[in-house]
Amino acid sequence: MDCPSCKVSYDEEVFTDNLMVCPHCNCHLRIEPRQRITYLTDENSFQELYPNLKTCNPIEMEGYEEKISAAEEKASLNEAVITGSCKIKGRDALLALMSFHFMGGSMGSVVGEKISRLMLKGATERIPVIIYATSGGARMQEGLFSLMQMAKTSSAAAELDEKGVPLFIMLCDPTTGGVTASFAMLGDITAAEPGALIGFAGPRVIEGTIRQQLPEGFQRAEFQLEKGFVDCIVPRQEQRQFFARMIDAHSLGLKETPKKKKA
């Protein structure tokens, strides 16, 4: 198996044992939600939520059902996000993990619904929410129904904030478009994986628009950290411990009922 960055070859087991991170250049390869669940959560603690929600082709876009079927086969998922409850080093958390292999991680009505439900559950039950974001943006095959999810997920994130329940975001490669312009930038802590592409429009679109070559590293996680767009960069091997610390640091008083704000 070749690293897409440095092109050095290793047995696939080497990549798997290293959480799909290249031992030579530290390139973080794109991985699937169930792989993340294995290294991030306590053994057998993940319980999937809302597994049967599926899109119904709301605007009857021709060929959409075929694209969904092909994506299901490619990603072994029925949508571009998995949501569930879990424990991370004994701490309770609600977890959403997006898949770029399912139609580019595009956010349609079901992705927005599952993420919104998860955040509202976190607000009601006062459980921290962690979202692993990776997406090419809104799902154009669902038209305005897709764009509506930006407001919907942002509203759910605001509910978490109102209830004082922490929302943690991990930006993975790539995170762009409508996901970047909505819930992915609304966390109490916004972290990123090394080298992740993060922005609204991708670099090729920007270069084609302004007809100029962008500087090396533009929109990568390290660039965004330097500009204050993300709070920290967390290597994959450290993410389990990182989220355990974040939950501890931000969860004081979660068992208490928040006081109502005076009108």
Curated annotation (Swiss-Prot):
It comes from Treponema denticola (strain ATCC 35405 / DSM 14222 / CIP 103919 / JCM 8153 / KCTC 15104). Its cofactor is Zn(2+). GO terms for molecular function: acetyl-CoA carboxylase activity; ATP binding; carboxyl- or carbamoyltransferase activity; zinc ion binding. It catalyses: N(6)-carboxybiotinyl-L-lysyl-[protein] + acetyl-CoA = N(6)-biotinyl-L-lysyl-[protein] + malonyl-CoA. One of its GO terms (cellular component) is acetyl-CoA carboxylase complex. Residues 1-263 form the CoA carboxyltransferase N-terminal domain. Pathway: Lipid metabolism; malonyl-CoA biosynthesis; malonyl-CoA from acetyl-CoA: step 1/1. Its EC number is 2.1.3.15. This is Acetyl-coenzyme A carboxylase carboxyl transferase subunit beta. Component of the acetyl coenzyme A carboxylase (ACC) complex. Biotin carboxylase (BC) catalyzes the carboxylation of biotin on its carrier protein (BCCP) and then the CO(2) group is transferred by the transcarboxylase to acetyl-CoA to form malonyl-CoA. Its main location: cytoplasm. Belongs to the AccD/PCCB family. Binds 1 zinc ion per subunit. Pfam families: Carboxyl_trans. Zn(2+) binds at C3, C6, C22, C25. GO terms for biological process: fatty acid biosynthetic process; malonyl-CoA biosynthetic process.
